[in-house]
Amino acid sequence: MIKKSTKRMEKIKGPAIFLAQFMGEEAPFNDLPSLCHWAASLGYKGIQLPTDPRLINLAKAAKSQRYCDEITAIVADAGLEITELSTHLQGQLVAVHPAYDQMFDSFAPKELRNNPAARTQWAIDQLKCAAKASARLGLKAHATFSGALLWHTFYPWPQRPPGLVELGFEELANRWLPILDAFDEA
């Protein structure tokens, strides 16, 4: 059985922009302060902050309130606020169907590639760090993906056997409930 979270957002923050789609090697897209000033110049009030190591040290944010205060200050200096952290790439790696292993390996750190079990554990740990970091940043929402465990069932051929989708969702619940619990506990 899947538990429902009882925490709710009190208000919507924004307009906000998802920074991951604009990150690059050249200014103003190559660091957090520059990205924030760029977003503010376009009229945005908030940012969805990707947990990319070029923008935030997720493990440090999970452990250090001072570091989170520094990140918040960088964002506030541009006149913005963080609406949520995002762990889209890590979330995808929580539940990868074996048929997609090779395609999704590039989302993981190089030292974890070709090791699905280590990659999955890293992704779970990242999400749990994100839960703690979100709490330290005072965030009530989080953006992620749930993985590619069931993608092959969207347009199946040949027909899938009875119970396959239910089994897939049970496995997603087994993997995600500890992560969601970490958000509730943070």
Language-model segment annotations:
Residues I2-G14, P33-L42:
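Non-catalytic accessory regions flanking glycosidase/transglycosidase catalytic cores in CAZymes
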Residues K3, D77, E81, V94-A186:
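Active-site acidic/histidine proton-transfer and metal-coordination neighborhood
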Residues R8-F29:
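Boundary/entry segment of secreted carbohydrate-active catalytic domains
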Residues M23-P28, N57-K63, P161:
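Short, flexible/disordered intra-domain loops and linkers
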Residues E26-A39, Q121-K132:
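Short, acidic/polar
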Residues L32-P53, L137-G138:
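Catalytic domains of carbohydrate-active enzymes, especially glycoside hydrolases
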Residues Q48, E84-S86, A143:
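Conserved beta-strand positions in the central sheet of alpha/beta enzyme cores
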Residues L49-T72, G91, S146-F154:
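Glycine-rich, proline-tolerant flexible connector loops at the mouths of alpha/beta enzymes
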